[in-house]
Amino acid sequence: MKIAIDAMGGDFAPENIVKGVNLAKKELSDVTFQLYGDGAKIRQFLDDETAIEIIETTEVIDFHDDPVAAIKSKKDSSLVRAVTAVKKREADAVLSAGSTGALLTAGLMLVKRIKQVSRPALMSTLPTADGRGFDMLDLGANTENTAHHLVDFAILGSYYAENVRGIEKPRVALISNGSEESKGSPTVKEAHEILSAMTEINFIGNIESRDLLSGGADVVVTDGFTGNAILKAIEGTATVLMKEIKSAIMAGSVTTKIGGVLIKKPLSGLKDLMSTDGAGGAAFVGLKAPVVKAHGNSSELAIASALKQIHKMLESDVSGKLVKHFENMDK
């Protein structure tokens, strides 16, 4: 099992990327990690080179680069070389914390989408109060979607939740402005009608955004514009909430500060619950092989989690199962 890694992509590359590999190596003994980038810089942070392949590259795609232009002009970039390795079957999957647009473009151009998948989608596992989490897609790979795109997303998300996260008959829901079947845009209503008739998916109907963090569904489907907005709202709310709690305690009386010390451990647990470090990266589902995007400011723990996520994707052969599913639909 080989995972190609863009070692130069991300705000803290290559340090956090390589340190994340060091952590993942301790648990993933059957994986060879291919690190693409500046070999000298990569070796500064490696514990050792066991199960490591370092592939020298001379270019880096910047967050400000135009994705399509960069893929075409920077062919020796760490990101393009890593994705190309998957295309050539020199690696089984790819991970990058670099430019989202460039990774999605490279994935589509080089790895290719599964036949009959109308649109691949960006999907991530987000936290819930019960610790179970839920998968939401699309998170921004597409800004506009048809009902049939949403139906494909539901299939992709359901397969992922069942095979990678081990959820039996995952509950699939559509984001809408009300839980009633009559609520939603024409696109959502059409998707609702199609999904309701599908026996292979455990479709439970509509879900409102206020119920997401309560664990009302295992897979949540929406268009890319809405999904991206919800994702950023969740991230922002969690950050502000923790900051305001801390500020209120520090600005309070001596009694308040003592109370703050007493609740420090529970608050730490809440922070861990809302953290995405252990959830892995965002998977670009609908492609012929796993392509995973880690957050640009990922910690070494987040990188290790993303690598373990990819390992589960490969071990369960979720991409292969999706290829067969959509091939059968075409018959």
From Swiss-Prot:
- GO MF entry, a single one: phosphate:acyl-[acyl carrier protein] acyltransferase activity
Catalytic activity, EC = 2.3.1.274
Cite a GO CC annotation.
cytoplasm
Key words, A-Z: Cytoplasm, Lipid biosynthesis, Lipid metabolism, Phospholipid biosynthesis, Phospholipid metabolism, Transferase
Catalytic activity reads: a fatty acyl-[ACP] + phosphate = an acyl phosphate + holo-[ACP]
The biological processes this protein is annotated with in GO are: fatty acid biosynthetic process; phospholipid biosynthetic process
Note whether Cytoplasm occurs among the keywords.
yes
What InterPro entries does this protein map onto? FA_synthesis, Phospholipid_synth_PlsX-like
Q: In which pathway does it act?
A: Lipid metabolism; phospholipid metabolism
User: Subcellular location, in the record's words?
Assistant: Cytoplasm
Per UniProt, the enzyme's principal EC class comes to transferase
Pfam families (alphabetical): FA_synthesis
Assembly: Homodimer. Probably interacts with PlsY.
Q: Which HAMAP family match?
A: PlsX
- Spell out the family assignment given in the record's similarity comment: Belongs to the PlsX family.
Tell me, what does this protein do in biology? Answer: Catalyzes the reversible formation of acyl-phosphate (acyl-PO(4)) from acyl-[acyl-carrier-protein] (acyl-ACP). This enzyme utilizes acyl-ACP as fatty acyl donor, but not acyl-CoA.
Q: What is this protein called?
A: Phosphate acyltransferase
Species of the source: Lactococcus lactis subsp. cremoris (strain SK11)
Cite the source lineage.
Bacteria, Bacillati, Bacillota, Bacilli, Lactobacillales
